[in-house]
Amino acid sequence: MKICVIHVNCEELSRDYTKLVEKNLDRVKREDTEIVHKYVAHLRRASDTVLAFPILLNKIDVVQRAVEAEAEGCDAVLVACSGDPGVTEARTLLDIPMVGPMEAALHLAAQYGRKIGIVTALDPSWAEACETMADTAGLSSRLAGVESIDIPSPIAFTEGFANPAPVREAIIRAAKKLVARGANVVVLGSAGLSVMASNTELAEVPEMGVPILDTISIGLKFAEVRVDLTKCFNVPVASRVGMFEKMDEKNRRRLVKLFDLGWDAAGQAS
């Protein structure tokens, strides 16, 4: 199968991060899974992934890349961002599975423990976004809390990719606080933290037996399962009753033109 991974970061400025992501995904993917990497077109600053207005703009880029991936023959799409940007919107346009890693990780976490803790970056807006995603997933009653690491993001997501050991220890400190608040399982609410944890073999809170879940790797495995369910049993890629109702081609073209998005029905720039 061929799975497209859409990165919500600037390719040219994220070499160290990209290497860690590729290493992680190569470890967990099936032998017959081919990964195609795509990047959003406009992002240049890391802060553009945590504030509401640039998140909206990034969603448009993600949807475009997802439509493009389907036209190129991909079997599923995974957005490599723990905010799941564009996932809901893309599902209304695609006939292949569209996976949000945070949604996938939260629902998997519910099978590992009763109370879920989320460790994320040192950013108040993103910590609040993580709470919102747990609520959207229907798991707010099972959320033990959200803890941010104690390393500023400009350091964690630059120096950390070259030397992830200090970030690893910061994740452990935050996870222990969540366990003290009742968490039985910890989800990493950050793509960057996820890849640094997995690349330093951090999969549980030391000496506690509490799982720590890498959202990006889980997202890839969910994508593989979703493809199998559709191919083997003809399970629809999403429910077409409700918020994932499929938009017809005529109206899709109309809206792309109306908002001057500059791409055609296959996601290509026009």
Feature annotation, model-predicted:
Residues Y39-K59, P154-G160:
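N-terminal beta-loop-helix "entrance" segment that forms/cooperates
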Residues L122-P124, A134-A191, S198:
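Active-site rim beta-loop-alpha module in soluble metabolic enzymes
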Residues L51-E68, P166-I172:
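Glycine-rich, highly charged phosphate/nucleotide-binding loops
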Residues A110-S148, P166, R226-A265:
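Short, glycine-/small-residue-rich phosphate/pyrophosphate-handling segment
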Residues R91-Y112, E201-A223:
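Short, acidic/small-residue loops that bind anionic groups at enzyme active sites
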Residues V63-L108, Y112:
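Glycine/small-residue-rich loop that forms an oxyanion/phosphate-binding "nest" at active or ligand-binding sites
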Residues I6, G189-N199, P211-V237, S270:
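C-terminal and late-domain segments of enzyme folds
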Residues M1-K19, I116-T120:
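Short beta-strand segments enriched in small/hydrophobic residues
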